Design a protein with these regions (language model features):
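Short, conserved beta-strand element in jelly-roll/cupin
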Residues: 116, 123-141
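Non-heme Fe(II)-dependent double-stranded beta-helix
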Residues: 1-13, 19-115, 121-124, 161
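General alpha-helical segment detector with a strong preference for membrane-spanning helices
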Residues: 18, 120-122, 141, 154
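Structured loops at beta-to-helix junctions and adjacent beta-edge loops in soluble globular domains
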Residues: 21, 105, 118, 135-137, ...
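Conserved hydrophobic/aromatic beta-strand scaffold that supports enzyme active sites
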Residues: 15-17, 131-135, 148
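Double-stranded beta-helix
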Residues: 141-168
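Short, charged/polar surface micro-motifs in flexible loops or helix N-caps
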Residues: 83, 107-109, 138-141, 154
Length: 168
């Protein structure tokens, strides 16, 4: 599934793209899980009497973490063959789940995410890890896809200081 060219691109540039590798069944699972998790976030917002929890903003953007074991079917996706193949192709045969999250932006009114390196938020030295980003809806640059910064464009392979954007 992952070609030698994609593996080399990961080494050279820090990323590769697997286009249309999720089955319709998997997409439906991920979409349904996202809906369930957003409903749970709304319930928690209601309980707390707020429209914002951390960087989740009601009906605009949601950041929902560490829930793979709490929605039926997600565990099988997270620990399934596709993720195993990605891990083996990038960081080797020994991989461990470090963090799982949904980032969902509402159509037309979603909030931006500030540019960041995922590792920049950790604040401690760590072993290499891989971030897998899977779109569950059709996307374009205009409607909010992720933007990657290849090594060759940035000119370095190290972390940079992160400045929090209060608007995002």
């Amino acid at each position: 599934m992952i070609s030698d060219e994609q593996k080399q691109q990961f080494i050279d540039e820090g990323y590769f793209i697997l286009d249309s590798v999720l089955s319709n069944e998997t997409l439906e699972l991920l979409r349904g899980a996202c809906d369930i998790l957003i409903d749970r976030m709304h319930s928690e917002m209601d309980r707390l009497g707020t429209d914002q929890i951390h960087i989740s903003h009601r009906n605009q953007r949601y950041h929902i973490a560490k829930q793979y074991a709490h929605v039926e079917g997600l565990k099988e996706y997270v620990f399934g063959e596709l993720m195993a193949d990605i891990c083996k192709a990038t960081i080797g045969k020994n991989a461990y789940l470090f963090y799982d999250q949904y980032v969902a932006k509402a159509a037309e009114v979603g909030r931006p995410f500030a540019w960041h390196q995922d590792g920049g938020y950790l604040g401690f030295p760590h072993t290499p890890y891989v971030t897998v980003w899977a779109a569950v809806d059709d996307m374009t640059a205009e409607n909010g896809t992720v933007t990657l910064l290849p090594y060759s464009d940035v000119g370095i392979r190290s972390l940079v200081d992160h400045i929090r954007n209060e608007e995002s």
